[in-house]
Amino acid sequence: MKAMPWNWTCLLSHLLVVGMGSSTLLPRQPPQLSQKPSFVTFRGEPAEGFNHLVVDERTGHIYLGAVNRIYKLSSDLKVLVTHQTGPDEDNPKCYPPRIVQTCNEPLASTNNVNKMLLIDYKENRLIACGSLYQGICKLLRLEDLFKLGEPFHKKEHYLSGVNESGSVFGVIVSYSNFDDKLFIATAVDGKPEYFPTISSRKLTKNSEADGMFAYVFHDEFVASMIKIPSDTFTVIPDFDIYYVYGFSSGNFVYFLTLQPEMVSPPGSTTKEQVYTSKLVRLCKEDTAFNSYVEVPIGCERNGVEYRLLQAAYLSKAGAVLGRTLGVRPDDDLLFTVFSKGQKRKMKSLDESALCIFILKQINDRIKDRLQSCYRGEGTLDLAWLKVKDIPCSSALLTIDDNFCGLDMNAPLGVSEMVRGIPVFTEDRDRMTSVIAYVYKNHSLAFVGTKSGKLKKIRVDGPKGNALQYETVQVVDSGPVLRDMAFSKDHEQLYIMSERQLTRVPVESCGQYRSCGECLGSGDPHCGWCVLHNTCTRKERCERSREPRRFASEMKQCVRLTVHPNNISVSQYNVLLVLETYNVPELSAGVNCTFEDLSEMDGLVIGNQIQCYSPAAKEVPRIITENGDHHVVQLQLKSKETGMTFASTSFVFYNCSVHNSCLSCVESPYRCHWCKYRHVCTHDPNTCSFQEGRVKLPEDCPQLLRVDKILVPVEVIKPITLKAKNLPQPQSGQRGYECILNIQGIEQRVPALRFNSSSVQCQNTSYSYEGMEINNLPVELTVVWNGHFNIDNPAQNKVYLYKCGAMRESCGLCLKADPDFECGWCQSPGQCTLRQHCPAHESRWLELSGANSKCTNPRITEIIPVTGPREGGTKVTIRGENLGLEFRDIASHVKVAGVECSPLVDGYIPAEQIVCEMGEAKPSQHAGFVEICVAVCRPEFMARSSQLYYFMTLTLADLKPNRGPMSGGTQVTITGTNLNAGSNVVVMFGSQPCLFHRRSPSYIICNTTSSEEVLDMKVTVQVDRARIRQDLVFQYVEDPTIVRIEPEWSIVSGNTPIAVWGTHLDLIQNPQIRAKHGGKEHINICEVLNATEMTCQAPALALGPDHQSDLTERPEEFGFILDNVQSLLILNKTNFTYYPNPVFEAFSPSGILELKPGTPIILKGKNLIPPVAGGNVKLNYTVLVGEKPCTVTVSDVQLLCESPNLIGRHKVMARVGGMEYSPGMVYIAPDSPLSLPAIVSIAVAGGLLIIFIVAVLIAYKRKSRESDLTLKRLQMQMDNLESRVALECKEAFAELQTDIHELTSDLDGAGIPFLDYRTYTMRVLFPGIEDHPVLRDLEVPGYRQERVEKGLKLFAQLINNKVFLLSFIRTLESQRSFSMRDRGNVASLIMTVLQSKLEYATDVLKQLLADLIDKNLESKNHPKLLLRRTESVAEKMLTNWFTFLLYKFLKECAGEPLFSLFCAIKQQMEKGPIDAITGEARYSLSEDKLIRQQIEYKTLVLSCVSPDNVNSPEVPVKILNCDTITQVKEKILDAIFKNVPCSHRPKAADMDLEWRQGSGARMILQDEDITTKIENDWKRLNTVAHYQVPDGSVVALVSKQVTAYNAVNNSTVSRTSASKYENMIRYTGSPDSLRSRTPMITPDLESGVKLWHLVKNHEHGDQKEGDRGSKMVSEIYLTRLLATKGTLQKFVDDLFETIFSTAHRGSALPLAIKYMFDFLDEQADKHGIHDPHVRHTWKSNCLPLRFWVNMIKNPQFVFDIHKNSITDACLSVVAQTFMDSCSTSEHRLGKDSPSNKLLYAKDIPSYKNWVERYYSDIGKMPAISDQDMNAYLAEQSRMHMNEFNTMSALSEIFSYVGKYSEEILGPLDHDDQCGKQKLAYKLEQVITLMSLDS
């Protein structure tokens, strides 16, 4: 093995000092919660991200796979060993990698990403797979990471070139006595032909063994792997399967995957790509992958679908969760994290869910599906693996839990999704990883998130819900990667992000400070260690097994009560009794502590503890501001641990704080009020005498509630107050006073206590400032002895008032509150109290008086001042003295001489009247408003100064006059006097138009929605006037949006969007909207015409914490087009917001200094949005000062040609809706120069001129070169164009000429039919050359007689219908009786019954009838009958037709079939055929078409006949690009034109000799020493290689041993064409179902690959240089058409012959008519009248069972050789034939397979032929059984002795031997069999045949 090119270095003891954080906390001072916990972390090399993590369960060591390195770490994350894995020179396109053979791709230093890391415990090694060299793996020793092996030289060693660390998963399956297996599942990154997506490999004991990673099983057809077929990529170009997790359980290995799928959203016909999460299951022992099943998984909560798998982990259920789910504690559960939706794989949405799956339920679902599939229900449902739907086949099997599949019905997909149980959802911080375990029967999950947090979740939380009990930030920046692992003891958890590995304790109980917090946290690890007063695990609490020392439930927490629980601050050394609950025994003693006041010993008596309160010097002074009490914690401290273990609140109260009686006695403590001393005390004995003590609130001195106390200003008046318990002042105490606080000024008034319940403030007058307040509430306090307050609990106030304030008119005065006793004093004309109105001079009006009407009403304003004559206008009249009651004005209002009826609702006494106008006469035009108040006397009448006018309203026009049906159009109606009146109603037909505003010349209203498209008459009603005018508004269909472009913007919006739609011009102010995170942004649009508008994209509302470089999709995106609801949210758009461009500031100072003319560069990122479609630009404007500059944009910078400015200017960049100034630019002017500077510049200038001249000369030369290059490119383009045109022209010309040539060529050749025996053998036993039924029975002589006797007896039994039917049915019911066996038995029975065809037909009919019954019983679709050969009857039917249609073939159908075969062969051979891939220039099959231009010439060689040297030379047409073998075959075809194939010499046995003029002879060969080898490709020799000219003479001679140019013999044999065909057919992929790409496998010894005309394109070896000779390969598909046209006549002839009832005088074979009648009979019997079903039965029975076989395999009928290209073309014809017999419609599109498209136009007419054929047969007279039997007897007689019946019987008997008991069983039980003693006879046969008899 050649030395590896890596420079491996093993860095031992490479210790990194990491942030050391202790995980065990000291019990005394747990850290404060505010501190961020510090964890042990490890950070690798800055440039290398971490990928994978695995912990050795035995040693606890950690293995960390990173980019370019593998680390081995100790459990506290110290580096023990590192092993370097990269970088190295590589190119992902090098396959095989450059370490195996040289690679022509450019190499670059490439990182090695760790894709898989597994511990192989059995062999003590680490398997580490990387991304370099197509994904090779290393095996490293666990101890020191020493490299044990690194297999890289075989295909199997390349796992996949994919570069992502998270897309590969491996599972090791271990065996005790032989080598382990490794199941590997990987994404393939678009290279499915190189890498299987899932496979099982050998893990050999020896790490350097050759078989390491070899497939567990591999032969020509089957292997332990599955590849993604290349066809899948045509449907989904970026298809891949991403593997998220894998594990083994029971007999199975499981993988969880994410894969793209095309689905149609509900209600849509177009398909869109989504991602589906699936579980894949395989049997551990399955080598052929028949057990592959895949099931979609997902979960849903509250209507939200979570379908994108993020991570998963397998764990056990645990007892608590098990009970909830109904499973056993040790059943497997799968914990999974999904994110919302199905749309995006990489940028998942943040909403995510934790779901659990019960593995057993998934397995049960798979078992159900397997059972239904083996009943024949449904299809295999695996879109990516089977491009078309393959139906399930039924088979009688019992499928148990461990069923591992057969080669049928596999691989299988389950279409129905298995839904997980959602236990927890998170909407903001996406969950990205999960790990779980069971702790003390509780099931716990630990989930990592996008932001680097760890969520701890108790899945079996209280009430059956999951409980998230803790969240910790564990890595600095997220996301947390999928791989998480527990330490060996499960006490620590290792968590990593791309840059950091952290060790986190599984629990952090120490953070909880109290028993309640600890046990309320929900963490099942935590309990309360009582005497140590800490929260901890039970095992860490001392003596936790003793009673009451460890609390694990809330009710076990310690409780403490104290009696008494409060004392006054002035009480000392009081005895306190403490009662304790849940306390352990306290024999060691206990202390009582009053916080930091005092500490003393407690006396323990049972569960009571006695303590004393603190002494005088220790009691706190309770400060007044803090209220009347002070709470301290009374704590109990254990003397054993020195820790406080219980505490309760204890109160010191202070009564003296209270200074009012009510607050004192209402205090919760024992406070008393001393009434005469006015103090509060805890000791009632200190009150001066007994009556003075107050304990109850009702005994307190206090004022009682009174109604409003009204005091007019400036009036002298006493205030009397009610009270109770007023104390009598004692000697030496002062009397009572009232204190009023008026506008901040205290006014004290002496007061008089009448008795204990009454007090009066003395006569005084009061006043306050200003006339803005007409009454003022004033605080009132009653005191005695100067400052002893009397409590005022009702908070009585005194109201001071002024009558004149804010009541300027008589009406307003009389409206005032009657309690004020205000009235109107007329002579000064003001509002006063009565005593202030001079009585002799004037009248005083008051409301209650008889004369209470105000005179002189006045009108100040009327609204509106115009109205229609018709009336109905509501006129509002405002003024003074307009009556005090409604009845005063109810009938006395006239407006412009017209009655106006007042309305109660609008009346405000004295101030406002609203009345409704009556109709005016035509003569009335204008007038004043006149009113009378109550009576119409002059002093009670008023007239307005404004005039009211009657108007005539007219309408002129409306704009716009059409709008959408949904409404919302703002319509302007123009006219005159449109502001008259009070109320406007606009109607469009019956739809209201909502009034908006108006002026004299217009009314604006908004339309409402209409149900239909209509023209509506416009009516406007103003009050009672209907304005008539023929205006029409047209409701038009709502606008629609057809498409928008581009479908993206940036987050700040304001980029232009072009919108196309219909009826867009209806909308006046269209707007575009986007809603995100519940916030909506709107922007404007401008309509260009009915179908186009341009909009400015709305911004996207993003929160401040949004990550700026993510792509976003708005929740809603749409348009606000008036009221059109349907466009508010566009469903079919995928509008995307890319991150805003971000600019950097010029420098920290923000100033950039430049020379004039230097461009300004603005650096940034996201300057070009990463749109999928390619070149998109944003429109940038950059202003320097005021001047714009021209901008060039790249992704990370803007280049701005600085304008012609000097000095300092601000730079401003604008794009979309954002502006940014990176700073100022300072452009320095050029400075004047000194003399030396000028001299030196002159010198430099001279040199520069010389230099420039030199440059110009060089430039001239260079530009000439580039001109040439341009011309060359131009020529190449022209060349390509002309070649495409030529190709099309050529194809057309060929089509016209070839048809004629072919038809003339084919005449006259005899048809080499096979004889009857060979023909039947090839159909009955395909592929078996010398079958026993053709030979005599071979038995040893001594047994011959017995055996013959036994077989004769057996023949009698076979001829017994009851026995034969029973025999066949029994065999068919055996599970091990395979499809091949069924076919074999059917053929053997038919050979035995060849001489008794009547009986055979009878049995066949019986079996078919049974089959039809069974088919209909099992509810299969009736059309499936006879579709596939799954029973003996179906194969017998084929054989029956084979026997009976031989004559028809020979006389009739054989000729067109042979002609078609010859035509195809000739047509193919007219053009080049690749000897290795089998592709040809002319083909009907797209797969076998050479898609390149191959230059070739036709040569005519003269060939000497090998048989007769003297016969004339035969001219043979060949091509100069033919290989030598191809030439030999063409020569043989020409010379032995009429000789059957089997009688001709083989090309491989002949040599081709070129006889040159000089008599020299040269042997030509496919490979010899002259063969050209180039870059590992060896090209087969062609005629052109030897430069054989046209007209040369060649001869075929028998093979020579050597020749001068021969190559060693081992390779000579390789040159036969069939060998290459085999090579193509079977290499590269184990089974044509799984991948259809041939792969030319290089010889592993030499690494050389053969080619002929085209290199196999999978190898990508065509270099860039070959581009010139390539053309778009699809151009060549026109050749299919040319070939089809050429062969059309022959296809038509064949189909016409087969589908006509009378052809060239040959009648329809009786067998066909007889069988079709039988099928019709059966259909009638079962009541099937669907013509499609009958048609299908007939098609399945004859065309599909017989004719298709003959068309595809003409070698069954003729003695010919069929090569692979002819085979491919015949397959296309056969497919067309099948399509013609089908009744279903084929929908074709541009993606349909080419063979369907090729004959799409012809198939309908062929279908008509088939229908006509079937109906003609139906109309023919029925064949009587007599006639039929006579015909069958004749057939039997003709072919009586073709087969050896004895040998056939012996073959059949072998099945009796195999299933003797099963066959005898039914014979014993059946009555008929019993009567005929069939069981006994069979036993006789068995006895005779047995060996030992």
Swiss-Prot record:
Domain PSI: 508-558, 654-701, 802-855
Keywords (A to Z) from UniProt: Acetylation, Cell membrane, Disulfide bond, Glycoprotein, Membrane, Receptor, Repeat, Signal, Transmembrane, Transmembrane helix
Residues of the signal peptide: 1-23
Disulfide pattern: 94-103, 129-137, 283-404, 299-355, 373-392, 509-526, 515-557, 518-535, 529-541, 592-611
Parts of the chain that traverse the membrane: 1237-1257
GO biological process: anterior commissure morphogenesis; axon guidance; branchiomotor neuron axon guidance; chemorepulsion of branchiomotor axon; cranial nerve morphogenesis; embryonic heart tube development; facial nerve morphogenesis; facial nerve structural organization
Database matches in Gene3D superfamilies: GTPase Activation - p120gap, domain 1, Immunoglobulins, Phosphatidylinositol 3-kinase Catalytic Subunit, Chain A, domain 1, YVTN repeat-like/Quinoprotein amine dehydrogenase
Domain annotation IPT/TIG: ranges: 857-951, 953-1036, 1039-1138, 1141-1229
UniProt tissue specificity: Expressed in the developing nervous system. Widely expressed in both the central and peripheral nervous systems. Expressed in the peripheral ganglia, somatosensory, olfactory, visual, auditory and equilibrium systems.
Residue numbers of N6-acetyllysine PTMs: 1349
Localization, UniProt: Cell membrane
Residues annotated as domain Sema: 24-506
Domain of life (superkingdom): Eukaryota
GO CC annotations, alphabetized: cerebellar climbing fiber to Purkinje cell synapse; plasma membrane
Glycosylation sites: 654, 1006, 1131, 1179
PROSITE patterns: SEMA
InterPro entries, A to Z: Ig-like_fold, Ig_E-set, IPT_dom, Plexin, Plexin_cytoplasmic_RasGAP_dom, Plexin_RBD, Plexin_repeat, PSI
Gene Ontology MF term list: semaphorin receptor activity
Disruption phenotype: No visible phenotype. Mice exhibit defasciculation of the facial branchiomotor nerve and of the ophthalmic branch of the trigeminus, with variable severity. In mice lacking both Plxna3 and Plxna4, migrating neurons do not show the normal response to Sema3A and Sema3F and do not migrate away from these semaphorins (in vitro).
Cytoplasmic topology ranges: 1258-1893
Extracellular side: 24-1236
Role played: Coreceptor for SEMA3A. Necessary for signaling by class 3 semaphorins and subsequent remodeling of the cytoskeleton. Plays a role in axon guidance in the developing nervous system. Class 3 semaphorins bind to a complex composed of a neuropilin and a plexin. The plexin modulates the affinity of the complex for specific semaphorins, and its cytoplasmic domain is required for the activation of down-stream signaling events in the cytoplasm.
Family: Belongs to the plexin family.
Subunit structure as annotated in this protein's UniProt entry: Interacts with NRP1 and NRP2.
Protein name: Plexin-A4
Gene encoding the protein: Plxna4
